[in-house]
């Protein structure tokens, strides 16, 4: 009997240790910016099942779509996505033609507590979920990152009762994005300096 209990305890311990290795998306409550985090901004007023924004540094196009709502965005003030009927029930974020490594979301003021479910679709087609969670009081920041060299294809937020808006979306690690001009300038300066050192060594 004792031997059987020991084997059971070992099996449970192994399960706990192994499970995280298959969880390619990591969910952390709160607003936890990652390296090279970019804000998503809207440059025009839009209405539809799909609306588009742009990152504030690389100017990469991003997409917000819904299977249930008519989405509404404005180009003025804080970046946020609302719904025509006043409550967002379903919204998916993606970066057309790219994957990404991190996404920060804030489904603001859901109608009901613990009514937010997040589904992350990875680049290999697998999915990871988080929730239900959320408070009716206001902010519901969630930071999504990745492990195991995985990348994110899209992030979906579902809420049966709906939430007021999705605000302050941020993204980082977009695949194939060229560094911003200031980064390129620093890189160019470094290459130029390295070439100068080589030239001096050769002249000796």
Named regions from a protein language model:
Residues 1-10:
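Bacterial N-terminal signal peptides that target proteins for export
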Residues 18-24:
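Sec/Tat signal peptide C-region and signal peptidase I cleavage site
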Residues 201-204:
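Short, charged juxtamembrane terminal tails flanking transmembrane helices
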Residues 22, 37, 181-183:
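Intrinsically disordered, low-complexity segments enriched in proline/serine/threonine
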Residues 179-198:
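A short, hydrophobic C-terminal helix/tail in secreted or cell-surface proteins
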Residues 10-17:
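Bacterial N-terminal signal peptides
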Residues 24-176:
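Surface-exposed, well-ordered secondary-structure segments
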